[in-house]
Amino acid sequence: MERSQKSARKKKKTSKSGNDRSIRSERKSKQKKPAGEKSQKSRRTRKSRGPKGNGFTSRETIQPSSSGQSEGTTRMDDQKDEKKDDKKEEKKEERKEEKKEEVKEPWSEEEPAKRMVANGFFTTTNVGGTFKQTDNFKTPMDSCPSFKNNMHKIRAPDCPIPEEKLVKLTNGPESFICAAKITVPDFNRTMILTQVPDLSSAPDIADFWRMIHQESIASVVIAVMPLEVTLQQILPLLSGTYSTYGKMFVNNKKVESAVGMTEYCLEIFPDGCSNSLLTTVYHLHNWRQKRGLEVVTDLVATMEKVMKVNDNTVLMSMNGTGRAGTMLTLFTAMLQVQKGKEVNAKETLASLRAERCGIVDNIDQFGTVHRSMACWFKNNSTNEEVQRKVVEFAPSIQ
């Protein structure tokens, strides 16, 4: 009995220990995972820990950051390449512009310029001989009654203006002004030569502006030295200022200055009239009376501007004959070339003097016309022979 109980207890213990072993083995088997699962779990664990895990960084955590760096570097490289390409394009455009500047465009006046050079327009003997051979026709005083009756208003009494050539003022107490209308070939606008008004007479200054407004003058070119005339007595010199001359209101809207010329943009209208006129006044201030002009660059540039405007024009000097007449002769010659015609200096001067006696005082002023034409040709012509001839005629032309 006792033996059977002991054997039963042994069997029970044995089964219990077996059960314990099986339980333990199951637990161990549960803890043990396939190698693949273990490595994936470890990688996930390492990845989740990242840089916080005792300074350890797995291969997977490095890859995203290195990829971001490579993308950023690629973008920077692309931007640098784009900048380089932009700079290359800018340099190409600059080279194109430089080439355009180097290669002059064909000048439309090239053919008449070549003919004038070939026919000896730019020779010293031609200038002197032509001037001496040109008559200075003077109109008889008896055929100039208005001129004769207003001698107190005239600076050059030896150069009478025919009645039909005088500018007649309207809407004022006086109708006379010492100004002549000139017919210029191929110029279908009004061209007037006039003297500087008497600065001691306020009515004379007012009459000048009355004429400008009445004749709708777009361009006024004044050739006087500062010592000859205080220009401020004739017009407001500062931008934004204005002056009144009798019933004429003159407003200075803009001023531009060059070396030998100052340009004024003026608004002109009679008192009580809203019909204003915009006029540009060009003042050439380095040209002495009875002399030629030494530096002709600004004179040529001014005549080019007047031709471009192609509107009613006034040319003014102290007496309205010498320097004003020289400017008129130059303007006429340039206009003829622009129309494709060859200039005959003798015929041009003679026809203008028939309009207004006293035009061009002397050979120096006539030489100014030729040197100005040489400067104009030099600045525009691409023909080698034209360039050579004008430089020979006026080596230091400027």
From Swiss-Prot:
Comp. bias (Polar residues): 55-73
Biased composition (Basic and acidic residues): 18-40, 74-114
Annotated spans, Disordered: 1-114
EC numbers, comma separated: 3.1.3.48
SMART domains (alphabetical): PTPc (SM00194), PTPc_motif (SM00404)
Family (UniProt): Belongs to the protein-tyrosine phosphatase family. Non-receptor class subfamily.
Protein name: Putative tyrosine-protein phosphatase C15H7.3
Classification lineage: Eukaryota, Metazoa, Ecdysozoa, Nematoda, Chromadorea
